[in-house]
C-alpha cells in the first residue's frame, strides 16, 4: 500500500504528481500511481488522453484511498460496510472527502475507534462478553468521529 509514491496528504498533491508523470510521458509510473491510490483504469486513461485536466477530484481520491485500505484490512470487522458508508458520505460532503485523503486519516483508525466504543459498551454492561451494535449506531459513531477529526 503506497509503496512507490507514498501516501499523499491531499488530492492536490496526488494530482501534482500525476501531472509531472504525464508531462514526462511516464505512463508506466502513472499507472502505478493510479493503482496505488485506487484510481480506476478508466479514469486514468481519460487523464492520459488529456481529456481531463486532473487525474482525480477529491471524492474519487478519497474513495480510491478507502478501497486500497480496505484490501489491507484483516481484523475481522465489517470494514466493507463502513467503506461503503464513508464513500457515500464523501459524495455528500467534500470536506469529508478531503479529510479521508489526509495522510493521518486511515480506515484502520476508524475501525479502532468503533472497536473502542464497543469495548466501552461491554464494560458498561456488567457480565456481557460482547455487544451487538446496529449499523445505524456504528454510522453515528463514524459521524461523531468525523466531526471531531476532519481538518
Predicted regions and their residues:
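Low-complexity, interaction-prone regions
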Residues: 1-82, 89, 150-151
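Charged, amphipathic alpha-helical linker/scaffold segments
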Residues: 61-119
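Long, highly charged low-complexity segments enriched in Glu/Asp and Lys/Arg with interspersed Ser/Thr
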Residues: 120-151
Amino acid at each position: 500500500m503506497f509503496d512507490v509514491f507514498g501516501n499523499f496528504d491531499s488530492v492536490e498533491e496526488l494530482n501534482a504528481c500525476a501531472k509531472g508523470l504525464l508531462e514526462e510521458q511516464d505512463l508506466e509510473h502513472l499507472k502505478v500511481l493510479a493503482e496505488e491510490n485506487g484510481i480506476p483504469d478508466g479514469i486514468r486513461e481519460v487523464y492520459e488522453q488529456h481529456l481531463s485536466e486532473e487525474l482525480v477530484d477529491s471524492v474519487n481520491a478519497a474513495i480510491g484511498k478507502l478501497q486500497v485500505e480496505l484490501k489491507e484490512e484483516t481484523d475481522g470487522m465489517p470494514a466493507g460496510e463502513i467503506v461503503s458508508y464513508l464513500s457515500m458520505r464523501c459524495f455528500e460532503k467534500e470536506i469529508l472527502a478531503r479529510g479521508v485523503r489526509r495522510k493521518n486519516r486511515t480506515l484502520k483508525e476508524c475501525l479502532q475507534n468503533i472497536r473502542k466504543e464497543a469495548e466501552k459498551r461491554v464494560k458498561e454492561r456488567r457480565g456481557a462478553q460482547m455487544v451487538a451494535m446496529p449499523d445505524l449506531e456504528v454510522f453515528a459513531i463514524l459521524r461523531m468521529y468525523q466531526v471531531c477529526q476532519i481538518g
